[in-house]
Amino acid sequence: MKYFIVDAFTDQPFGGNPAGMVLLDSDTFPKEELMLQIATELRYSETAFVKRHSAQEFTIRYFTPKAEVELCGHATIASFFLLHRKGLASGQCLCHTKAGDLHIEAGEKVMMQMAKPRIIATIDETEDIYQALDVKNYCPTMPVQIVYAGLPDLMIPLPDVATLQALQPDMQAISEITKQLEAVSFHVFAFDNDGYTAHVRDFAPLYDIPEESATGTANASLTYYLQQCGCLGNEAECAFIQGEAMGRPSVVTTRIQVDGNLFVGGRAAVVAEGTLMIEV
């Protein structure tokens, strides 16, 4: 099996969010235990296992070093950028995932249509959430909500970018809270007048990801959240900057349409290629 390391949401190696990608050469996926072992060996936040049916149809399964997840935005962007570069995908593609079927435009910039977004819950008692971030200055005008655009993520507003960059997150507390709320991550954001829609940080220690430098799914959820809060119109394009505190700045592009369809995407850079010397 061929494997690749691809940095998503950047056009430069060692920027953006790295993902592992395994291109399968059989009609069936390996056993789950083996895919988990491979993801653990590669040590990236997510590894995508890609099965190609044709140049326009694929199936992807996603594994963190700890568990399988239904969807990973940045690993999908990375995978289709690589497939395009290898001449294995072009134009409008259909991708089957456990979160549902995704419509993807494969090219030098990859855009993927997300699952129909929805607000799962509004969290009224937020003291423990902000305490887990060591934040005392809340953002009282905007709610803390669990939003779904393929995965459930907790949207947490902060009053300014300085507070965002100075966070001292308690990973154990975040793990416990996300487990209790059945959410994947704390997706924390703040506004600034610098041309970006928002600056964001994402913490998912429950899935062995202390912090992620670019999170496609969660930023899609944030786009819908901001629209529902009245910060965006019925149709909008957004650019979220993430990963600054990690030294891996990433730009995640999103688009929400009048019909409610939601897209997320960006560029990528292929960093490495190799062969897994194992028998399936």
Language model: regions and residue ranges:
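Active-site proximal loop and beta-alpha junction motif in alpha/beta enzyme cores
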Residues: 1-71, 77-280
